[in-house]
Amino acid sequence: TGLSKGLSIFSINVNGLNCPLKRHRLADWIQKLKPDICCIQESHLTLKDKYRLKVKGWSSIFQANGKQKKAGIAILFADAIGFKPTKIRKDKDGHFIFVKGNTQYDEISIINIYAPNHNAPQFIRETLTDMSNLISSTSIVVGDFNTPLAVLDRSSKKKLSKEILDLNSTIQHLDLTDIYRTFHPNKTEYTFFSSAHGTYSKIDHILGHKSNLSKFKKIEIIPCIFSDHHGIKVELNNNRNLHTHTKTWKLNNLMLKDTWVIDEIKKEITKFLEQNNNQDTNYQNLWDTAKAVLRGKFIALQAFLKKTEREEVNNLMGHLKQLEKEEHSNPKPSRRKEITKIRAELNEIENKRIIQQINKSKSWFFEKINKIDKPLANLTRKKRVKSLISSIRNGNDEITTDPSEIQKILNEYYKKLYSHKYENLKEIDQYLEACHLPRLSQKEVEMLNRPISSSEIASTIQNLPKKKSPGPDGFTSEFYQTFKEELVPILLNLFQNIEKEGILPNTFYEANITLIPKPGKDPTRKENYRPISLMNIDAKILNKILTNRIQQHIKKIIHHDQVGFIPGSQGWFNIRKSINVIQHINKLKNKDHMILSIDAEKAFDNIQHPFMIRTLKKIGIEGTFLKLIEAIYSKPTANIILNGVKLKSFPLRSGTRQGCPLSPLLFNIVMEVLAIAIREEKAIKGIHIGSEEIKLSLFADDMIVYLENTRDSTTKLLEVIKEYSNVSGYKINTHKSVAFIYTNNNQAEKTVKDSIPFTVVPKKMKYLGVYLTKDVKDLYKENYETLRKEIAEDVNKWKNIPCSWLGRINIVKMSILPKAIYNFNAIPIKAPLSYFKDLEKIILHFIWNQKKPQIAKTLLSNKNKAGGITLPDLRLYYKSIVIKTAWYWHKNREVDVWNRIENQEMDPATYHYLIFDKPIKNIQWGKDSLFNKWCWVNWLAICRRLKLDPHLSPLTKIDSHWIKDLNLRHETIKILEESAGKTLEGISLGEYFMRRTPQAIEAVSKIHYWDLIKLKSFCTAKNIVSKASRQPSEWEKIFAGYTSDKGLITRIHRELKHINKKRTRDPISGWARDLKRNFSKEDRHTIYKHMKKSSSSLIIREMQIKTTLRYHLTPVRVAHITKSPNQRCWRGCGGKGTLLHCWWECPLIRSFWKDVWRILRDLKIDLPFDPIIPLLGLYPEDQKSQYNKDICTRMFIAAQFIIAKSWKKPKCPSTHEWTSKLWYMYTMEYYAALKKDGDFTSFMFTWMELEHILLSKVSQ
């Protein structure tokens, strides 16, 4: 109900929760009733079963369970009330529990009791007396007392016994009272029917303190079908003056899978446009009205579907209530019989519904479990911090828990933060007039201003991310994708009107802000929350179109010092740049330098809109594009959603809009003004390395400044930032900004420290997720060793997660590999082999759960041989990252400053001529080279292993030293590049020199005679032809063929994997020996493919992978390991326990397989009785039918499961268990197919024939 309406408490005796179906029904019931506190009695759960009780939205669960499956009670607190316990007391036998604590509004204590059937009044009296010191005015006692408290509590109207009277006396002495009798002194309503005595009674009670009676608002008995008791629910008034919890509508995407709903909405869209789209209607208002109409239609459709679904249940429940009412006043055996019948009907309906829900949920896990998907991610990620804010510090630095005051404090804080608007337009213009900003050309501006097209809208809708929270209007991305054909023309007209008028629909300005606590920060301080904003999807579509346009020209506007949100730029560029600068400073004899990491105060939120708009004008943006951005920032508003309450909206007069795809680029453009000011200010001395002066590195608002002549440069830097801040709104936290200081002595360092307002750190600072160290020799320790420690801690946290070894491999790929790649990418320094061996050991221990591996790691590293599952080799990824620097050398891009400044001894131009070019004599790498020398060593080693010449290749550039050293004219090289391409491959070496293409033949006549002779002599030389007149290898293509670094690591890693193949025992060869057969190359391919394609579910495919890879231990293998002479079959047949024997030859197993083949014959499938078919998926060549293969594969894998389950048991696997497993697979695939368009036909085709046989077997 939520505390806005008061606190609701619900109590129910559930009569056992060991059945999963019962637990699901209870959870479903709680979610429908939505009590704030739910008290459960007689759960029959034991101490070890406490994790079985879970209800989404009620995660604070306190239980008292005994050692046996008797008694057992629990109290569940809704997440919405933010309950924090202060005192808990439990009964070791599970008969009572006391929990005291605070909700976000009030203190409360609950005593939940389940009295035993024998001497119940005495037990209650003793329990309450024993806890009398804990009972206060805030206490509420609930539970199944197993005794009435008043004469009216029994249908027999029998007098109360002495024990009950004594109990009532104790209750009165403790100032407690029966709340139900206080509200209904003369009413006869019961919670339990005793079939043995044929009587009704109210033995479930809620007691409250007399001093607090005014808080109790309502109490009622709630009929319950799944238990033999009815529930009892009480509502308490909330005396605090609170805002009502906001009910925000959000489209249920499941409705979009219903074709009837889709058709109805399409009709509604057409009808709305026919009635309202006319010249008198403003199109912006038309669109907002359309959304309101469609929202109403969705609500009506959902209500209709819900009513239709529950109609039968509601009719039966109404009839049941009427019969029970009549039965209370005038009992009749016939009526009792009808009541029992209706309850049974209701139970059957509800059970079917819950089973369907369970199967849908199971089928989702069936498809996704152990894969790189949501279930695994949920298992490994940290528990999400609850965003409930129950206390905050006020202006006097005192903590307040008053909800109204919390709401006021936070709303005022964010209103002030976003409403700080500068009006100094003249100062802004003067400041920007003095800035030398780059400008877009007229043609580029025209491209920005071209009319929005329907194809742009359709493409943007298609690429919207799915399963994301919608904005205030509640319409999701899936809504726009489902009705794309209908909505694109409407949005096109809307956007065209916006382009003409410069006015957005009102809903485009709206946003909801949710506050998320910053990790590791004091949650009682208002500034320690991160505001997350949600805009409406239609506004995002428009903004994304604008983003796509400006992104094409952003590199012309933004300097390569900025790498955040810039296409083709990566964060590690600036990390490498910073490390190279640090290394350079450390080499200097005279030091007066500083590396400063500037912390901006809410940088995105403080940017002033007038400054941003004028900056856009300064870089040449004008016309329609500028008009649209001005419209977006003309009057945006936001509402904070705080603990479910929507606070009063306020205008956003500063800051880029959160959740808007355009915001990062606009912010970068605004930040570029400051970056240019710093670069152009000569008094701010940067670090000089060779011909480069390095001053800045930026990733959005993360800024590092490199300074020489520290005191004077810092003074001027602060002046420049202050001037910028005065017009832009940008502010820095000087105390949070950290710096490395480099001086010649301690006295000089102290002088610098005293003169700057920043925090000086002695050893390290964190930047973009890695540690920069003051001395580069500490990089390995602070990053590589830290990474190893983090991985070890992570796998230790995950050691008990419920997933198989395949799931653990995927966890490594999903959670460990990205982290490792990021660290290696940022800092690819030399690391010892022992480091990777340690990582491998940690990972293998995790995968096999501290047990001995049952499959060789070399086998698991081969994707094709491991059923599509690959165990990542971190050392190979590391090598790939180290080598990839060579690609950047070959491309010689101007933006790669990070690469050129590493080594002062080497001419930066040299790097361009290292790859596939004439050898350079005496390369001066320098003994301290961190990255490039290590890359070069590894690059050469791989080329040698591939038997490739690292200096000459078909992809050697025409402007290489090989050609330039021929002293050709510049015009000749230009002609060659225009006619034959950029590489030697286009020239055609040897006898076909310049004769392969018409363009080449034509070019010959243009080349100077002596140049042609020199060129021909070079291109026909035997040593050149032998090395370069061939098809380029994949390795050569990686570095010289691809123009983008996207996927570069993957491509290099793929080649390195191919080179580093390690020999291991081939499981297929093992099967060949056992089966005394030879498998051809095609057979092996079929077996490997069968492992990968046998099922869409990894839990099913895992069985086939295990079988093919010879995973299971056998008596022969165990005897070899333990050096025991006993190799006999564990099933007791006396045979030698080889793998083939355990799977096929054992008489008990053979009998089972014959039963399987009998079913095959029933399906009219004729297959030879051969183990290679069920165990390896190698079907006879004449078995062409894919249907037969699909259904047989499912049957055989189910059989493998049953055999593996009884692996060491001396019995024949059960055919009943096999059919049950098949039925489970059928059910899971059925629900999975229902969710996917087009899959159900395939499902029916596969299972149609087998379904009839399964039904007959299961029913037996």
Curated annotation (Swiss-Prot):
EC number: 2.7.7.49
Pfam families tied to this protein: Exo_endo_phos (PF03372), RVT_1 (PF00078)
Organism per entry: Nycticebus coucang
Stretch forming the signal peptide: none
Other comments on record: This sequence was constructed from an alignment of six sequences, determined by these authors but not shown, belonging to the LINE-1 family.
Gene Ontology terms for molecular function: metal ion binding; RNA-directed DNA polymerase activity
Alphabetized UniProt keyword annotations: Magnesium, Metal-binding, Nucleotidyltransferase, RNA-directed DNA polymerase, Transferase
Name the UniProt record assigns to this protein: LINE-1 reverse transcriptase homolog
Residues the record lists as binding Mg(2+): D599, D701, D702
Top EC class of this enzyme: transferase
Record-annotated Reverse transcriptase domain positions: 497-772
